[in-house]
């Protein structure tokens, strides 16, 4: 359920609407009835910004200060964008400032770790670092002060979030274009891999899927009278002959903040999207459905949101219903498949890019394979030399033992008077091998060491 109370009040302002992260969430296919009762705030959806967590934590802390919340409710979009609201930070409580200081220190520490990781990666010549994007990681912080959260930090955070989220839709369109080009590229490669008969059958199946996808009820133009009346009748359960724009606006202002934000607008397009896309159908692509939802929302914002603050007020909404285009049904809404996301030239460049990346990956894989084979050969030589050395040492030990045994089996020398004469105990004195045998052992050891080649080990994989 959408938040109410102070958090709902934030949605009155275009920037903090974005900061509360409602602009980029895809709405569910079903929506419950409005509930005006106070409910606990739910976790906000992720914007996709790399500083999302920091942004959300700053908002949560500022909301706890009564003075700042009061100024926020009285501020307008220009006050926020110009930095006027940021100066109110000087009047928040010491407890809140302390929390903000700690949040900033944590964010600085996070970015330092990120910088260190990228610098380490830069040491590897095979890794390329985008220095421009690296610098952008710090644009939402005041570089002159890394310890305390000041008005300049709030101003930078607001400006950066406003700019980044304004570019979100363009980035989404570009991502969808690459998705469509990759899908077409893989389709063509698949067809090329088939025999003539199999290719004809695959093409026939694809054409049949495209035909089924095109066969759908007429899609009304988003924001038109026909589209809103359909929501009024089928979703709200009201008499289409008694359609009232003001009542419609109030019904679909879910959090009762006096404006329709982007999420509330996108909820109005659900019935139109269901005419074209069904997740159960093989021919319906859900990625295309989300692109369609975005196109519909952009169309309404372009024609209704006159001050371009990404919010639709009641006055703007009522004014749009007075225009000629509001009641003009025409041919209906042209869906995504009627507007190709890319040209053949863009597809050609995309395929060249894919081929270059594939060649680079293959070259790296080949180098890795060669280095692995070289390491395997070196390891094999090491193992062979180790076994040879072990055998040589064992052989020498056996020769020494044999010599000692032969020495021990010799009879004791006889005394001239016919009595045996035993020598005193000589355990502590080493008994040298006969000169000939010792020379032979030394020669064997020397030859063994000379035969051991130097081992060359690859420096890296």
UniProtKB/Swiss-Prot annotation:
The modification Phosphoserine is found at residues 86, 369. Residues 1-26 form the signal peptide. Belongs to the nucleobindin family. Interacts (via GBA motif) with guanine nucleotide-binding protein G(i) alpha subunits GNAI1, GNAI2 and GNAI3 with higher affinity for GNAI1 and GNAI3 than for GNAI2. Preferentially interacts with inactive rather than active GNAI3. Interaction with GNAI3 is inhibited when NUCB1 binds calcium, probably due to a conformational change which renders the GBA motif inaccessible. Ca(2+) 1 binds at residues 253, 255, 257, 264. Discovered as DNA-binding protein in the serum of lupus-prone mice. Ca(2+) 2 binds at residues 305, 307, 309, 316. Residues 193-221, 368-461 are annotated as: Disordered. One of its GO terms (biological process) is small GTPase-mediated signal transduction. Residues 228-321 are annotated as: Binds to GNAI2 and GNAI3. It comes from the Eukaryota. Expressed both in fetal and adult heart, lung, liver, kidney and brain, and in adult skeletal muscle, placenta and pancreas. Pfam families: NUCB1_N. It is found in: Golgi apparatus, cis-Golgi network membrane; Cytoplasm; Secreted. Residues 172-218 bind DNA. The EF-hand domains are unfolded in the absence of Ca(2+) and fold upon Ca(2+) addition. Residues 42-51 are annotated as: O-glycosylated at one site. The modification Phosphothreonine is found at residue 148. Residues 240-275, 292-327 form the EF-hand domain. SUPFAM superfamilies: EF-hand (SSF47473). Residues 150-218, 341-407 form a coiled coil. This is Nucleobindin-1. Keywords: Calcium, Coiled coil, Cytoplasm, DNA-binding, Glycoprotein, Golgi apparatus, Guanine-nucleotide releasing factor, Membrane, Metal-binding, Phosphoprotein, Repeat, Secreted, Signal. The keyword Transcription does not apply.
